[in-house]
Amino acid sequence: MLYYSMPALAAGFILDLMIGDPRWLYHPVCLIGNLIAFLEKILRKIFPKTDKGELAAGTVEVIFVCLLSGGIPFLILHILYGISVWAGFALETFWCYQLLATKSLKTESMKVYDRLKNGTLDEARYAVSMIVGRDTQSLTEEGVTKAAVETVAENASDGVIAPMLYMAIGGVWLMFLYKGINTMDSMLGYKNDKYLYFGRCAAKLDDVANYIPARLSGWLMVAASAFVKMDVKNAAKIYRRDRRNHASPNSAQTEAAMAGALEVQLAGNAYYFGKLYEKPTIGDGIRPVEVEDIRRSNRLLYATAIL
């Protein structure tokens, strides 16, 4: 089965670049998200509402989601490859195509670009709110642009490089397992009263799962900046200096490479759920952020993915 994973990865990646995610096609990550929400609701009723109880409930959730998100695709593919190699290859290619987010990331970020160029600031704020977790209602044009660029940078690892790496290692079932871990972190990994203990296991596991992919993505992005005629020396400098400027051990890896390549400053303070979070900046800000940086960030994303 693993013998066919690399050709399926190549075919799935090409399909992702060409087609992206059609809105009418149900996405498997939505199914994983529904599973996470369902299990959370059940487990919160079963376990006591104490710190230890929530930690235990969150750990049980992680175990179940990992078993189901990786195990079910593995079993389906194992059975299908046993029936027909071509059927197994076709499904593995299709799932790979669905789980990669290269074109959809470009499409969504370019909606922000379009609203900044041809619409109103409120429309741009709404467009960027669809792809970021921070509060966007009071963002300036520069703030909206930075948010879009940061999302492209961070998701270059989470949505493209990391899934490809895991599929190359173990096949598409391992890509599914990674997406299960990553989706749990995005839904449960908040450091607030509700998820501080319940989401701790999910957040820690996501840190582990992304440790190598994030660093690989950072260096790939530094190298890719040379192919799209960006500042490769500054990308390497800022990456080495600022790649730890984030509460997460992984999130700043590609943001630092992106900031250096574009010669801009990213990150900094942001509001989440009405509360100000003070965060260090990334990059020197050789020049101010401008709307065209969204387009440039996508060029760098594609170059990184192809490398």
List each model region and its residues.
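Hydrophobic alpha-helical transmembrane segments
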Residues: 1-177, 181, 189-307
